[in-house]
Amino acid sequence: MTVALLKTAAEPATTAATSDSTAANESSPTGDVTSVPAIADAGISADVINGGRRLFGKQLALAASALAVAGWLPQRQAWAAGSDKPEKTRVQVGFIPLTDCASVIVASQMGFDKKYGIEIVPNKEASWAAVRDKLVNGELDAAHVLYGLVYGVHLGIGGSKKDMAVLMNLNHNGQAITLSNQLNEQGVRDGESLAKHIQKNPREYTFAQTFPTGTHAMWLYYYLASIGVHPFQDVKTIVVPPPQMVANMRVGNMDGFCVGEPWNARAIFDKIGFTLATSQDIWTDHPEKVLGCTAAFVQQHPNTARALTAALLEASRFIDDPRNRATVAKLIAGKAYVNAPAEVIESRFLGQYDNGIGRRWQDPNYMKFYNDGQVTFPYLSDGMWFLTQHRRWGLLSSEPDYLSVASQINQIAIYKQAAAAAKVPVPSDVLRSSKLIDGKIWDGKEPARYAASFSLNSAQGVAA
């Protein structure tokens, strides 16, 4: 099984999107595709842009002023001295320019970090591979990161093994699969018509995701399989960093991609693609990004880990208040963060969906950050689900000890301490049950059996 890595290099502006449609300082696509091992390094060579504290000053000042008047800004420091004092007070937190990085930015810029005696320094990264590498080598203390990436590193899938930790879940929902307008012009409107088109018009169809073990890869594979398309036999899969998806579709490097917002909405805004399916269509209230770090960071800085989690819990609660959504969209839209028009971020951030080919709807299952603590709790069943899909698609050559691995990674004890400090309710069970797009029920109770239940798979020894 192979995927392809889309290489990038500096190129004339005529072959790539303009600076206002992709993240600042990103390389332009070349279209040069190379086959690589399935879990090869999924990154690109690029300088990391440090989001730091640079922001579009007037907007932030006005937003902060309004929030202070409304009584939203933190008024006191919760942990500043004694045995609870954070061991490390300046915390480097990585993020990728996606809408769901919002809790990191809000915690930093709205002062929720100060309440818990720390300073969050957001670091904007160029690719998920860069996030992985900097977490592992200690350049980043923690990061907004793909759930499945953390589990892959912990198990050494495709690279060096490093014990990892998930402090909390950051969001549910809010990703999507986008197809090119060329497919729409050829009659593709939905999953059924896509499957028929691929069968009747044989050629090399190329779909992009953002990291081989990550969430976008798993949503893409799961959706394609649900319509009878094998993601490794019937189509070609490549890896592209999120901010470069739109530029690469524009120059014809792919037929479709799976990524987080706002890049699906941006493809529609730029009139180059349409939304085939949202990730909440695949799994309503699915886990997505997490606050991830190494196990060593938690062991060496338990108070800092707890303070960081508490700060992001408060930020998550703030974001989920409908009164704050438009303000947050403007806050994260700047070049230091997502680097996209605020209106492109805001529409789907508010659940206002337009698929680009005539359908508009208000989605009740839009991107959520809190939902009374249901979003943020690190359910063991959520982590185990990604392991079942890694097994299904041959990324794991043998069955892991699902529950043991999830229990090692997901830091439920620290989460509960942070939740108590932030006055966030905690679910009573570490497992939850969900029904996915193909009708299968996932409850975390028989993971090996679940992993083996899929007729479309790439794993040796796995058969439905």
Each predicted region: which residue ranges?
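Ligand-binding pocket segment of bilobal, Venus flytrap-like solute-binding proteins
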Residues: 140-142, 240-275, 294, 326, ...
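N-terminal secretory signal peptides
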Residues: 1-55, 76-79
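Conserved C-terminal helix/tail region of periplasmic/extracytoplasmic solute-binding proteins
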Residues: 384-464
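Short, glycine-/small- and polar/acidic-enriched structural segments
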Residues: 80-239, 251-268, 272-285, 435-455
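Secondary-structure end/capping motifs
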Residues: 300-411
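N-terminal export leaders
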Residues: 53-70
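Short glycine- and hydrophobic/aromatic-rich loop-to-beta-strand nucleating segment
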Residues: 177-178, 290-293, 297-298
